[in-house]
Amino acid sequence: MNKFLKLVGYDESKKTTVRTELIAGLVTFLAMAYILTVNPNQIVGEGSPYWASVFIATALGAVIGTLLMAFLAKMPLAQASGMGLNSMLGGIIGGWGGYGAQFTPGQGFMLVLISGLAFLLLSVIKIKGKTFRELVFDGMPLSIRSSISVGIGLFIAFIGFQNAKIIVDDPYVLLKLVDFTTFDDSTKNAIVCLIGLFVISILDKFNVKSSIIIGVVVATVIGIPLGVTNLSVLAGAGDVSWKFWENFANFFTGENTVFLSFTKVFTEGIAPAGISVFTVVMILITMCMIDMFDTMGTIVGCCGGNRILSDENNKPLNYGKIMIADAIATCTGAVLGTSTVTTFVESGAGVSAGGRTGLTALSTAGMFFLSMFALPLFAAIPSAAAAAALIYVGVLMMKNNVKDIDFSNTVKSTSAFLTIAIMVLSYSITKGIGVGMISYTAMSIMSYVIQLVKYAVTKKNKPTFEVSAVSIVVSVLFCIYFFVPAVI
């Protein structure tokens, strides 16, 4: 037993016990279990014939990714399909992502695989003692990194508002708030979502670690008398079954399995006709950037400042292995048929509960494995209830990152604002990042030139060039993406 515990880094000197580690793993699972329902909804939509396959892929991706954290990194961190990236993938597959065409599920997952392989290379290749990933991360301005997270948070919250029918179409002003006086299906969905959101917010105020999943469950129950929650799925209706072996059989061999659609890429190509190679490249760069920022921000947030989980320089222990585990998980998840698997900030719930080693991650992985056998329970959760989780995660992403935007600097604040606004209004994460990067680089260079001219005249306050090579290269690539049509 002791030999096994050492495999996951368990050591009593870290001021923990087996019981504490197992409970911490359960706490982490409860904090992030919402992803099992939200992810299929985001990628293929509620009621899709692919829903069950994506659910199983989501669970398996979380199991494998979290096991990598347990045995490779030996850290109390959990992985699953990342929020924001699943919305981006859903837009790519659904045709509403602003790329001019609808990708097949297999093509979408192939993009995820390639971005994962790129992230893995960035995590391994070193230049002057630093991995290429660290150099890229350090080369991106903090205001842009933070605004990307804020923008994604607002973006997925906006999707949640639409899924719950809180925000509906309007022929005159495009969008409007649902009319609560009609008490129609849209109103009922909105009420269910708002109740769930309020429950989550109140519970989180009192530090209830499983607030999100409790709020989703409460919203689901409220939806029963309102006709929003469809309980027929619990009786075996639709494409899911309590006979778990049937769900697994469908995942590997069924007509509507994403797992098999992935293999069609080798005969159908990586992108639809009419999509340029450069567009594909920019999608891959965007995926890689988001995964990089999410992962590095999460592990520093969960482990930094904790004397047991970080070194004397406040750098998380086993930092390199954490990044490699994250990259491998992304590749594995793509092959299974789910969006980018990344380290979850909800891992902090388990750390707060006393998790200190990979045994916590092992416990979380075990819970995700068991969840695959309860597929109908998760399938019964209506989109309106799951939307409450989407909106609240958006709140958290904004709260945790907006403070890092320097609003006293007009160049940084303007470029950050454009990143956030364009991301939401264009319904495209890629375009939001592109406009933000170009505006930051252009305004920074113009400001430097003006300051340089001023220095040449006054010989006072010599300016420093603050724009990194990474920012310039990324901005040039986005300029080509925006201004040069039909490249290759």
List PLM regions with ranges.
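Helix-loop-helix hairpins and the membrane-proximal interhelical loops
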Residues: 1-54, 175-182, 216-320, 459-460, ...
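Helix-loop-helix junctions within the multi-pass membrane cores of secondary transporters/permeases
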Residues: 2-39, 61, 82-91, 95-152, ...
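Hydrophobic alpha-helical transmembrane bundles of multi-pass membrane proteins
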Residues: 26-28, 35-36, 50-65, 148-152, ...
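Helix-coil boundary and interhelical linker segments in multi-pass alpha-helical membrane proteins
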Residues: 41-53, 91-107, 273-280, 382, ...
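Active-site cofactor/substrate anionic-group-binding motifs, chiefly glycine-
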Residues: 50-94
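Transmembrane alpha-helix interface/packing and boundary motifs in multi-pass membrane proteins
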Residues: 65-77, 201-207, 286-294, 326-336, ...
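Membrane-embedded alpha-helical modules
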Residues: 101, 105-225, 229, 362-488
